[in-house]
């Protein structure tokens, strides 16, 4: 028996309990998931692979937790069995929306708002927010995490996490759970221009690995990338030198205990369009050095004065090259403006 019909531009899919009708082709539900997801991903990820920058924004925004974003690919983390609210904003009054979920339970819609209750099993699930009057979609990657209380001392399923320090402020509360990383989900696009693999801690281990990843840092990186391209430069993504760090790894490299990397809210980045694993010469002076990073710094720093950017305010710091790496820019979210140059 039919449950609902969704119009997606040239595609019309009828969702039943087991199959989806797409045109004259009968598809398994999993295959239909891929088609719907591909519509949101194709516009940006294909452009990235072809060397063409596309910001990857929808014509509306979606609020999850404290962040409202119009990027077509978004990521949230949620503990097993808990709920998250989703609300559409910045859309015309005539716009009509619907949601498709591949698991969990969805509340009845109210004023463009829904509540999704996550499944009890830790895994990657997806929520599609679809504008039905015109073809426009946001895909939410919902990672149901492995709860922190599953830690056995410093280890989670054999992967060494370490111990989080006592939180001096609310933003340093211990994570409620960890995203499980496997070879199968490494290449998931967690935003239009960044993949999960870019944020995995560098400590040596087998699989599974675990990460914490804040949606705010993903949005901040996407906004900086968008402004970088708008300023006349070109990059399809940033190379992430360091994303999430476990407390164990962070201590091993001698970093400060309260580094925002440990909460999945920081990234060390540089531009590497030529694939040489080193900062590109973006200012055209014939050298690849800290002056190129300062171009990136200035673009990111200018954003801090904008009202819509305040939820992403945090640290911004430049680092020069050494024997282990080239110059890079540190970006984080911490609720207050901090700047440094090294």
Feature annotation, model-predicted:
Residues 29-154:
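Beta-strand-enriched, solvent-exposed domains that form extended recognition/catalytic surfaces
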Residues 257-342:
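Catalytic cores and adjacent binding grooves of peptidoglycan-active enzymes
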Residues 172-233:
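Active-site acidic/histidine clusters and adjacent loop/turn architecture
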Residues 220-254:
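Extended, low-complexity, intrinsically disordered C-terminal regulatory tails
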Residues 122, 247-262:
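Charged, often glycine-rich, active-site loop that binds/positions anionic groups
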Residues 2-15:
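N-terminal Sec-pathway targeting helices
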Residues 118-196:
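Non-catalytic propeptide/linker segments at domain boundaries
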Residues 12-25:
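Hydrophobic membrane-insertion alpha-helices, especially the h-region
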